[in-house]
Amino acid sequence: MKKINAGNLFAGMRSSSVIAGLFIVLIVSIVLLFANFAYLNTQSNHDKQYIGHAGELRVLSQRIAKNATEAAAGKGEAFKLLKDARNDFEKRWNILVNGDESTSLPPSPEAVKPQMDVVQQDWDGLRKNADSILASEQTVLSLHQVASTLAETIPQLQVEYEEVVDILLENGAPADQVAVAQRQSLLAERILGSVNKVLAGDENSVQAADSFGRDASLFGRVLKGMQEGNAAMSISKVTNAEAVDRLNEIAELFEFVSGSVDEILETSPDLFQVREAANNIFSVSQTLLDKASQLADGFENLAGGRSINLFAGYALGALALASIILIGLVMVRETNRRLAETAEKNDRNQAAILRLLDEIADLADGDLTVAATVTEDFTGAIADSINYSIDQLRELVETINQTAVQVAAAAQETQSTAMHLAEASEHQAQEIAGASAAINEMAVSIDQVSANASESSAVAERSVAIANKGNEVVHNTITGMDNIREQIQDTSKRIKRLGESSQEIGDIVSLINDIADQTNILALNAAIQASMAGDAGRGFAVVADEVQRLAERSSAATKQIEALVKTIQTDTNEAVISMEQTTSEVVRGARLAQDAGVALEEIEKVSKTLAALIQNISNAARQQASSAGHISNTMNVIQEITSQTSAGTTATARSIGNLAKMASEMRNSVSGFKLPEGVEQA
């Protein structure tokens, strides 16, 4: 028997060494297989990144050409897109040249260096032109902004000049003035055409800029000649007021045109360079696209030139599979050997199990006095465990007997308590029903309070509206009094001027009275002289008497006028005093009305505050009514819960009675166990 075991031990050791060797071969082949595939996967990822960057270079080359053309045309957003495309191209190109640490991408292999060199040459030229366009961004945008403003201003100049021509024709202006005005409209059209040629940026842009400067200068000189006259240019000054106003408006519009001449002349060469750079980019972009495509093809051809490829991986996979098959064969042979040993061991264990079953056969009948024999076989531990279980079962049966007695006593006491709780729950349900009815009555009262508060709020709101209308009436009254005061002041001023005029009339009347007195004296002297002349002066004496009578009548009339003037002055002064008093009363009335307006505003504020408070009371009453309803519902729920509790307590009492019965049945169920002598039986 020992020789057989030693042979089995030697065979097991030899099988283990063979399996270990095969496992080593398997692990090495798997490691090499994964290393090969990892290398291929890494190189494949690198190739994908190279190809992706090369493909993006093709797209970016065309995007740069498109954005450069749009930037040269003056589109502001194109400059940002051009800059982004240029920077993106340079970033991706630097990654292809120097690698990318963030993605562990190495520089491009030497195999694609020829394609890289030709792309580098085209990129250097394209980048230089793109940088030139980006450096001129402000110049290009400013020039296009000026041109856009000119495109709006010059048509306005033409419209204004057409109106000037119409005005001159309607008023019969000289033909040379009309012809000059018409030429100005045509000259403005030519200025706009020159600006558009400058923006084109072709070989004629510099010449167009010079033409723009000359035409703008000529337009300004002719405009000034029409405003002020210019003999050297044979332009006469426009004198029609309406035409002069139009020329002044034209001069204001032309200030921007004349101010833009220098800027356009200075920046037009830069715009030509930008256009030339955009054209260069467009011509190079197609070549760069082709060369970038060749570079992408070069990256795609890298995989075929590597020394380690999929065939090596397949060979390592076959080696690993062969190792697995050999390991399986060795393990099958080892398993058969162990199965034979296990069969022999099972026979010995079967005999020990039968012996143990004979010893514990009485345990199935409830005899807890039996004990199993502990041997050195594997059943020894089982026998020891069975003996321990029998001891624990003895203690359990004893504990069940004691517990059943205690449970029966506790169940009877608990049943009595549950019945008392059921009676208390019924009484509590009756009290809750009464409280719920009282809460419902309180909710009805709160609803009535809420309705009264809502009505009071409506009354307060009407009070606010009335106060607001009263305030508007007071403001209208104040406005009317202010108008009356202004009219009274105007009337007072007119009456004062009437008094001053009457004073002047009085002065004139006094002068006439003095003249009448002097005329009377002169007539008297003439009569004396005529009487002294005798018959020769008789006719003159008659005239002198007539003059004297006229002087006396004039003196009497002037006295009457003087009396009337004094009466007018007196009435005027009284009217002025009355007007001033009326003005004072109007001012006082306006102040009183203003005070009334302030009082009404206070009433309005108080009414609004009162309305808000009443509204708050109404809201609070509604909330209380809602809360009362909620409390009522809660009380109903509590009443229902109490009813359920009462029913549950009654059911609990019945369950506790059943528990007492179950405790008795449990004592009966363990009464069949046989315990050693000296232990209390159930």
Curated annotation (Swiss-Prot):
It comes from the Bacteria. Residues 347-398 form the HAMP domain. GO terms for biological process: chemotaxis; signal transduction. It is a multi-pass membrane protein. The chain crosses the membrane at residues 15-38, 307-333. The keyword NADP does not apply. CDD domains: MCP_signal. PANTHER family: METHYL-ACCEPTING CHEMOTAXIS PROTEIN CTPL, METHYL-ACCEPTING CHEMOTAXIS PROTEIN MCPB. This is Protein PilJ. It comes from Pseudomonas aeruginosa (strain ATCC 15692 / DSM 22644 / CIP 104116 / JCM 14847 / LMG 12228 / 1C / PRS 101 / PAO1).
